[in-house]
Amino acid sequence: MCDKADNHIDVQPEGNLEVSSVSSTRLYRRRWVILLLFSSYSLCNAFQWIQYGIINNIFMKFYQVSSFAVDWLSMVYMLTYIPFIFPVTWLLERKGLRVVALLAASINCAGTWIKVASVQPSLFWVTMLGQFACSCAQVFILGMPSQVASVWFGSDEVSTACAIGVFGNQLGIAIGFLVPPVLVPNVEDMGELAEHISIMFYITAAVATLIFLLVVFVFQEKPETPPSLAQVALRNMPTGQHSYLASIARLMCNKPFILLLISYGLNVGSFYAVSTLLNRMIIEHYPGEEVNAGRIGLTLVVAGVVGSLICGVWLDKTKTYKQTTLSVYLLSFVGMLIYSFTLNLGHLWLVFLTSGVLGFFMTGYLPLGFEFAVELTYPESEGTSSGLLNCSAQVFGIAFTIIQGKIIDHFGTLAGNIFLCVFLLIGSIMTAFIKSDLRRQKANQETGGNADSSVHPQHGETLPVKEVKM
């Protein structure tokens, strides 16, 4: 049982945190290289999540399996995440960013080469094995944007850096919507179809191999000097306070975080369901439009990329975490309603437009959830809070994909989309009840205030953060 004391995290700096250590915060130019590398292997992995689902009918024909079986090539990403996130988060706590990055890039690379060997109609199980390997790599990736941002970037950059980290994943999904319908056209000759699939798999494997080599030789654990006062406080924290199980227990007693955990899962789970079933929804109303289904998916994600970056910059400037998160959540609900009631009107241009509106807010919500969670749970590890958020998203994603798929089969796409609208409304209401306890901001202000009293004569003046070469 949780008492009131358990739900409180003291964010005051340790008594031995001297001004000299606080004033040594620095920003390294290499932080942008690290962020680019992370975004690159995240992109490669996310591309593979959706590469089957967006041409669902083509892979059904090639492997001679049901649409539900092809759906599982996407849902395996969600299923794998749930049991493996806890050991992976523990590994992140013990071994750090570099080990996790190496495992992510290497397992993802291995999965791509397994799929290269699966281009025969009788080898569906091999392509599932390769996809399973890639789904394991995803566990090392999905919760990392906020961790990379906090470890490498200053307090005025973390939200933007987190948004850029999420951007890599979103861009991978966007390419996954766009490229497979172009590389793998719906041809009748099975030999020709196998050749097209093989080309797609070989290109993916080559890119994954190059990224893996870059991670091996370039990716670093952390900067020598911390980039922010909050990171200084964490580095000065006694190691006993970094217990993973104790951290999980404290998070489970944090009521604002629990509300965010559920509402985040409802929103992102809805996005996973829409993305996985997009081909089926578009083809039902617009037969033969596989390529345009991919382009609609691209529109959905690109609009979300823009939304993510705008929201990240907005958070860095305003620090209005709850207000922004609630506004974007409500607009995601509105966007889903508009998409639901315009999908069957027979105008593809309208579907492109409504998908863009939906994507701008629904995908734009992703970095908001990460950063709001970090604020609510500081000084707990960013990887732990992000991992739990993503675990919630996977659970709801699997449930929503299966249930919405069955509803579409029996009652049509409108009923399936209304099903998601109901849960987005519930998530919006839950978000409104989250208490805005911005602990990381308090830590930066209080630590900075202590330093100001010793080295700055003017109230509110902050310590300079130096940017140095790589």
UniProtKB/Swiss-Prot annotation:
<feature type="topological domain" description="Cytoplasmic">
    <location>
        <begin position="219"/>
        <end position="254"/>
    </location>
</feature>
<feature type="topological domain" description="Extracellular">
    <location>
        <begin position="49"/>
        <end position="66"/>
    </location>
</feature>
<feature type="topological domain" description="Cytoplasmic">
    <location>
        <begin position="1"/>
        <end position="23"/>
    </location>
</feature>
<feature type="binding site">
    <location>
        <position position="394"/>
    </location>
    <ligand>
        <name>choline</name>
    </ligand>
</feature>
<feature type="binding site">
    <location>
        <position position="45"/>
    </location>
    <ligand>
        <name>choline</name>
    </ligand>
</feature>
<feature type="binding site">
    <location>
        <position position="138"/>
    </location>
    <ligand>
        <name>choline</name>
    </ligand>
</feature>
<dbReference type="GO" id="GO:0015232">
    <property type="term" value="F:heme transmembrane transporter activity"/>
</dbReference>
<feature type="topological domain" description="Extracellular">
    <location>
        <begin position="117"/>
        <end position="123"/>
    </location>
</feature>
<keyword id="KW-0812">Transmembrane</keyword>
<feature type="topological domain" description="Cytoplasmic">
    <location>
        <begin position="153"/>
        <end position="157"/>
    </location>
</feature>
<feature type="transmembrane region" description="Helical; Name=TM11">
    <location>
        <begin position="385"/>
        <end position="410"/>
    </location>
</feature>
<dbReference type="InterPro" id="IPR036259">
    <property type="entry name" value="MFS_trans_sf"/>
</dbReference>
<dbReference type="GO" id="GO:0020037">
    <property type="term" value="F:heme binding"/>
</dbReference>
<feature type="topological domain" description="Cytoplasmic">
    <location>
        <begin position="436"/>
        <end position="470"/>
    </location>
</feature>
<feature type="transmembrane region" description="Helical; Name=TM12">
    <location>
        <begin position="413"/>
        <end position="435"/>
    </location>
</feature>
<dbReference type="GO" id="GO:0016020">
    <property type="term" value="C:membrane"/>
</dbReference>
<feature type="topological domain" description="Cytoplasmic">
    <location>
        <begin position="95"/>
        <end position="96"/>
    </location>
</feature>
<dbReference type="Pfam" id="PF07690">
    <property type="entry name" value="MFS_1"/>
</dbReference>
<feature type="topological domain" description="Extracellular">
    <location>
        <begin position="184"/>
        <end position="188"/>
    </location>
</feature>
<feature type="transmembrane region" description="Helical; Name=TM2">
    <location>
        <begin position="67"/>
        <end position="94"/>
    </location>
</feature>
<feature type="topological domain" description="Cytoplasmic">
    <location>
        <begin position="319"/>
        <end position="320"/>
    </location>
</feature>
<feature type="transmembrane region" description="Helical; Name=TM3">
    <location>
        <begin position="97"/>
        <end position="116"/>
    </location>
</feature>
<feature type="transmembrane region" description="Helical; Name=TM4">
    <location>
        <begin position="124"/>
        <end position="152"/>
    </location>
</feature>
<feature type="transmembrane region" description="Helical; Name=TM7">
    <location>
        <begin position="255"/>
        <end position="285"/>
    </location>
</feature>
<dbReference type="InterPro" id="IPR011701">
    <property type="entry name" value="MFS"/>
</dbReference>
<dbReference type="GO" id="GO:0031966">
    <property type="term" value="C:mitochondrial membrane"/>
</dbReference>
<dbReference type="InterPro" id="IPR020846">
    <property type="entry name" value="MFS_dom"/>
</dbReference>
<keyword id="KW-0472">Membrane</keyword>
<feature type="transmembrane region" description="Helical; Name=TM1">
    <location>
        <begin position="24"/>
        <end position="48"/>
    </location>
</feature>
<dbReference type="GO" id="GO:0034228">
    <property type="term" value="F:ethanolamine transmembrane transporter activity"/>
</dbReference>
<keyword id="KW-1133">Transmembrane helix</keyword>
<feature type="binding site">
    <location>
        <position position="142"/>
    </location>
    <ligand>
        <name>choline</name>
    </ligand>
</feature>
<feature type="transmembrane region" description="Helical; Name=TM8">
    <location>
        <begin position="290"/>
        <end position="318"/>
    </location>
</feature>
<dbReference type="InterPro" id="IPR049680">
    <property type="entry name" value="FLVCR1-2_SLC49-like"/>
</dbReference>
<feature type="transmembrane region" description="Helical; Name=TM10">
    <location>
        <begin position="347"/>
        <end position="376"/>
    </location>
</feature>
<keyword id="KW-1003">Cell membrane</keyword>
<dbReference type="GO" id="GO:0005789">
    <property type="term" value="C:endoplasmic reticulum membrane"/>
</dbReference>
<feature type="transmembrane region" description="Helical; Name=TM5">
    <location>
        <begin position="158"/>
        <end position="183"/>
    </location>
</feature>
<dbReference type="GO" id="GO:0005886">
    <property type="term" value="C:plasma membrane"/>
</dbReference>
<feature type="binding site">
    <location>
        <position position="272"/>
    </location>
    <ligand>
        <name>choline</name>
    </ligand>
</feature>
<comment type="function">
    <text>Choline uniporter that specifically mediates choline uptake at the blood-brain-barrier. Responsible for the majority of choline uptake across the blood-brain-barrier from the circulation into the brain. Choline, a nutrient critical for brain development, is a precursor of phosphatidylcholine, as well as betaine. Also mediates transport of ethanolamine. Choline and ethanolamine transport is not coupled with proton transport and is exclusively driven by the choline gradient across the plasma membrane. Also acts as a heme b transporter.</text>
</comment>
<keyword id="KW-0496">Mitochondrion</keyword>
